Structures are given as C-alpha cells and as structure tokens.
C-alpha cells in the first residue's frame, strides 16, 4: 500500500521522489548482487548450481549488507526532521 503524499508536495514532486527511490533501490540491489557474487562465487564455475559453501556465503553476505545499509540509513536520517 502506498503512503499518502505529504502536505505541500505536488504529484509531480511525489512521482520524482518515487522515481529517485526506485533508482536507488535498483542500484542497491545491483551493488549487493555484484559484491556478494564476487566475494562468494569461484571465478571458474565447476557446477551449474551454487554449492553449499557458496550458498552460505551469499546468505551471510546479503544479511550483513542489509544490516549495514539499515545502520547507515538510520545514521543519515537521525538529524533530519520527518518528511
């Protein structure tokens, strides 16, 4: 369910904000995927599927990435008034 548009924000501004947020999320996902893949998957593929070690590594990597991303977000928004 979408959030209501904040008071004083036009629909065009809200659309622009949503578009910026979507671009940020896509970039975040791409960086996460690239970082964890490079860290956890061997450069020379031996099997078509991820092995158990690679699976565990990717799981931990993604978990840590999201945890740090949340911490950074909280720190950045700590001094800002709510929108």
Swiss-Prot record:
This protein's encoding gene: TIM10
Pfam families: zf-Tim10_DDP (PF02953)
Keyword Zinc in record: yes
Signal peptide boundaries: none
Protein name in UniProt: Mitochondrial import inner membrane translocase subunit TIM10
Chief site of localization: mitochondrion
Top-rank lineage group of the source organism: Eukaryota
Functional description taken from the UniProt entry: Mitochondrial intermembrane chaperone that participates in the import and insertion of multi-pass transmembrane proteins into the mitochondrial inner membrane. May also be required for the transfer of beta-barrel precursors from the TOM complex to the sorting and assembly machinery (SAM complex) of the outer membrane. Acts as a chaperone-like protein that protects the hydrophobic precursors from aggregation and guide them through the mitochondrial intermembrane space.
Record's comment describing the protein's domains: The twin CX3C motif contains 4 conserved Cys residues that form 2 disulfide bonds in the mitochondrial intermembrane space. However, during the transit of TIM10 from cytoplasm into mitochondrion, the Cys residues probably coordinate zinc, thereby preventing folding and allowing its transfer across mitochondrial outer membrane.
Segments carrying motif Twin CX3C motif: 36-61
Species assigned in the record: Arabidopsis thaliana (Mouse-ear cress)
Keywords assigned by UniProt, alphabetized: Acetylation, Chaperone, Disulfide bond, Metal-binding, Mitochondrion, Protein transport, Translocation, Transport, Zinc
């Amino acid at each position: 369910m979408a959030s209501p548009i904040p008071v004083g924000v036009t629909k065009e501004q809200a659309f622009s904000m949503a578009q910026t947020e979507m671009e940020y999320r896509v970039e975040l996902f791409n960086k996460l995927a690239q970082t964890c893949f490079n860290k956890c998957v061997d450069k020379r593929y031996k099997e078509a599927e991820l092995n158990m070690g690679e699976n565990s590594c990717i799981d931990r990597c993604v978990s840590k990435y999201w945890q740090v991303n949340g911490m950074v977000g909280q720190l950045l928004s700590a001094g800002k008034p709510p929108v």
